[in-house]
Amino acid sequence: RIAATADPEAAERARVVLVEQADRVAPELGDNPRSLIEDALVQSGVEVRLRETVERVEADNIVLGSGERIASCTLIVTVGPRASPLNEAFGVALDPSGRAPCDDMLRVIGVPDTYMAGDVAMAHVDDEHVALMSCQHAITMGKFAGFNAARDLLGLALRPYRQIRYVTCLDLGRGGAVFTTGWDREVQMHGDEAKQLKRTIVSERIIPPTGEREAILAAAALDG
């Protein structure tokens, strides 16, 4: 990315350090794709500090819990998503990410006549797993919430939200990408092939149609 926005020489001079408080890289993604992620970090020249935390941020460096001082002009902090604080207005117990609990129909539990979808909603995708705060689940949740809200107004039967299929497609920079399936994230594809799939996903598949009415309605189909 530095090479694309500046020049290759600047990219080669840049020092990138990943600080992770866990004892391994990308702990939330499990063991299956980890070797590919680690290889991509090495390929990109990223230094890794495991079991570490940032204790202090100063004008031109950061100080780690171990006392190591890293000279820096840019600090990027990734600490996980947080739901909109508007959820607090519902007066219900929220999950650690600030999401409101929903039943299988995506109705907010304890709040009558209220449907919810996306990052603000905590709902099960199957009998074991809860939806993640990602477009993969938010898009389908939106379809079900809209479907059920409309049918509720008409006094028609509702349909439980279920989204059994789960995939992960992670961009790895120079290392291409890795595509996995299932909650155990079995690797199905990696490298340039997975990179092309990632580009297709972000540029086509998650973009809703804006043209013909028929295309818009087709995209909203629950089984589409």
Over which residues does each language-model region extend?
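Rossmann-like dinucleotide-binding cores of NAD(P)H-dependent redox enzymes
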Residues: 1-52
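Cofactor-binding loop segments of dinucleotide-utilizing enzymes, especially the Rossmann-like FAD-
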Residues: 21, 119, 174
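C-terminal auxiliary extensions adjacent to catalytic cores
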Residues: 174-224
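FAD-site-proximal beta/loop scaffold in flavoenzymes
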Residues: 61-62, 69-140, 147
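SDR active-site lid
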Residues: 129, 156-164, 182-189
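A conserved short coil-to-beta-strand element within the FAD-binding core of flavoproteins
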Residues: 50-61
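Internal hydrophobic alpha-helix adjacent to the cofactor/substrate pocket in enzyme cavities
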Residues: 136-163
